[in-house]
């Protein structure tokens, strides 16, 4: 029997799914993250998980993005051979992009446009987050099975691939590789591992495995049924025993699950891919059967645990950014929690590159960074009465190569971002007696509530990568690298790896 899929239904389903996953976490992720929160013994990691859970519920209630990076769209289509497409002005992939465009430009909840059409030269933003990455397979049947995902750059950039010898140890490679990924992929999350096929097939297997439901708690409770499930448990436990923890701060839970997908391969080969999924974990599954657009049921409010993060005013230091001095910055200790109030500047990859070019030419910068703090962020556009949309930190290591320049030539005194800093940046921070502060990735809507005013002050043509001035009140951050160059992303995981090795713990 032939099924007719109409263009409008297809487009509306893609757009609706992208809106849905921008503000609703999958139920399985929340259940496993809540369990990790209950088990966590590290105060810093527990606080980070509390922020993620609180942010998640806020986003569900406010229908605003979980993360400011609303991702590059991945769509997996299994198209029944008895399906007929009606009213499609172009191909199926073009229809996917029509849906992406509609979903990302929704005036009630505009999503951040992050896609640049020319990846090597001009890197100009397409303004509507198209094109998507589309995988299509023809299968028997009369329906279209659809998986829609939106993958953030922080986790996608940590993807790994290796071509192993057949006798090489997969477990050893994973345990050696995960620490090199840092915390820019926003753990706690999921690892997807693809084994076999060819290089590109292994990468696709890893990505597809991340679309499966998280079931590690159930798997451990009932025990493995086969070698693959036993390997998943082994990898999950051993990765968590590394002590990396939530946001890389050190703790019991780094991964909530490990997924494995395999395909036949050449006798001389063992291609292995590993792709992490972050704390946003955006994906949805639906089937089009010709009856109309897909409907995705909103999750029950009862899904979320009774976790309501709020600043700890007894343990946190209040900082006035408008009166901040280098001496005060140098007094901060690793792990200190700060509540920032006052004016800060923003800037990320494109802004730093342009600043570098302007300084090289002796040109005047659009803003004075002297005595200022910079926040690595590309916010979502505001709606209704918002000052700014979700505005969580981006991965800071991408700005490492600019750190010496910014501290030495602009008068900048501190930086805010996500995850760890590399050796060169840490040395620059130590040399200039500066500091690096971190916010929690995956808590973008929560963070945005601390921003009371926002205006573009430079490089407006860069869109979300423009330089903004934010006026904030009690914005929560942690001292991640102090003026002596001590990094909590080094000390925290080392401490918790040792603790886990010496104490019996239940790994989430």
Where do the protein language model's features map onto the residues?
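Feature captures the catalytic cores and cofactor-binding loops of soluble hydro-lyases/lyases
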Residues: 210, 214-243, 247-250, 346-475
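Short, well-ordered loop/turn sites that connect or cap secondary structure elements
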Residues: 329-332, 338
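Glycine-rich beta-strand-to-loop/alpha-helix junction loops that act as flexible
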Residues: 191-198, 341-342, 417, 440-441
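C-terminal binding/interaction regions
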Residues: 250-258, 265-266, 279, 449-508
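Short, structured beta-strand/loop micro-motifs enriched in basic residues and often containing a Trp
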Residues: 314-324
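Residue "hotspots" at secondary-structure boundaries inside conserved domains
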Residues: 327-330, 367
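Non-transmembrane, aqueous-exposed alpha-helical and coiled segments at domain scale
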Residues: 1-312, 408
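Short, charged beta-turn/beta-strand-edge "cap" motif at the junction between a beta-strand
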Residues: 337, 343-347
């Amino acid at each position: 029997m032939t099924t007719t899929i109409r263009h409008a239904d297809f487009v509306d389903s893609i757009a609706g799914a992208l809106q849905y996953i921008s503000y609703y976490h999958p139920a399985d992720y929340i259940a496993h993250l809540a369990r990790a929160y209950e088990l966590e013994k590290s105060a810093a990691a527990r606080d980070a998980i509390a922020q993620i859970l609180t942010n998640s519920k806020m986003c569900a209630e406010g229908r605003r993005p979980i993360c400011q990076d609303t991702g590059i769209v991945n769509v997996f289509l299994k198209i029944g051979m008895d399906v007929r497409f009606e009213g499609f002005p172009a191909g199926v992939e073009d229809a996917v992009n029509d849906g992406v465009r509609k979903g990302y430009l929704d005036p009630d909840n505009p999503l951040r446009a992050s896609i640049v059409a020319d990846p090597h030269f001009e890197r100009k933003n397409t303004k509507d987050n198209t094109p998507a990455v589309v995988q299509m397979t023809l299968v028997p049947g009369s329906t279209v099975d659809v998986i829609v995902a939106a993958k953030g750059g922080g986790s996608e950039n940590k993807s790994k691939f290796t071509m192993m010898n057949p006798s090489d140890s997969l477990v050893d490679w994973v345990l050696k590789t995960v620490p090199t990924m840092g915390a820019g992929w926003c753990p706690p999350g999921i690892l997807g591992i693809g084994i076999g096929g060819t290089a590109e097939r292994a990468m696709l297997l890893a990505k597809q495995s991340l679309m499966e439901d998280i079931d590690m708690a159930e798997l451990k409770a009932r025990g493995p049924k086969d070698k693959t499930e036993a390997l998943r448990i082994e990898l999950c436990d051993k990765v968590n025993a590394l002590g990396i923890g939530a946001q890389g701060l050190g703790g019991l839970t780094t991964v909530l699950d490990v997924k494995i997908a395999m395909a036949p391969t050449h006798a001389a080969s063992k291609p292995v891919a590993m792709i992490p999924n972050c704390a946003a974990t955006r994906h949805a599954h639906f089937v089009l059967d010709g009856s109309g657009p897909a409907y995705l049921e909103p999750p029950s409010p009862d899904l979320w645990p009774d976790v309501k993060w709020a600043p700890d005013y007894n343990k946190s230091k209040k900082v006035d950014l408008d009166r901040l001095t280098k001496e005060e910055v140098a007094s901060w200790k690793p792990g200190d929690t700060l509540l920032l109030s006052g004016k800060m500047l923003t800037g990320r990859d494109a802004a730093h590159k342009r600043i570098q070019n302007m300084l090289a030419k002796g040109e005047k910068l659009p803003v004075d960074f002297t005595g200022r703090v910079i926040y690595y962020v590309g916010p979502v556009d505001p709606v209704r009465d918002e000052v700014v949309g979700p505005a969580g930190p981006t991965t800071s290591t991408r700005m490492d190569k600019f750190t010496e320049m910014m501290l030495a030539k602009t008068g900048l005194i501190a930086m805010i971002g996500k995850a760890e800093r590399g050796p060169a940046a840490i040395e620059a921070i130590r040399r200039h007696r500066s500091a690096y502060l971190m916010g929690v990735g995956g808590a973008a809507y929560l963070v945005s509530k601390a921003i009371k005013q926002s205006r573009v002050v430079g490089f407006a043509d860069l869109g979300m990568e423009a330089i903004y001035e934010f006026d904030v009140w009690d914005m929560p951050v942690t001292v991640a690298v102090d003026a002596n160059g001590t990094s909590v992303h080094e000390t925290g995981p080392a401490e918790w790896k040792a603790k886990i090795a010496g104490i019996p713990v239940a790994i989430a």
